[in-house]
């Protein structure tokens, strides 16, 4: 049986070196062995995000948020995944929460505002002229 810490460490090293596809392999194994570990799931979410597997990444970040509802980074990443899946209305809540938790993070506010702007035209009423 593989050691969870070894898998996690190897995955994080690959992630740090920009080898996102390769990082997903040991991180997925580590997650399967320790599904309750927020740090493993966050790292796996990052690897999946960078390989444009946004649906899978969103599931990992959602698992982190379920355990730690005030984890601003996981909220932000969840929101970004939802945006990139075209689910702007759903992205608004986690992005707004992340921006509220860390008001100095201008990137959080930027993507929160973009999600809101993407939704607004869909809800705008046509002029009665």
Identify the meaning behind each predicted range.
Residues 1-6, 126-128:
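TPR-adjacent "capping" and linker segments in tetratricopeptide-repeat scaffold/adaptor proteins
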Residues 17-29, 51-63, 85-97, 119-128:
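Structural signature of tandem alpha-helical TPR/SEL1-like repeats
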Residues 62-84:
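Mid-chain, well-packed structural core segment of small domains
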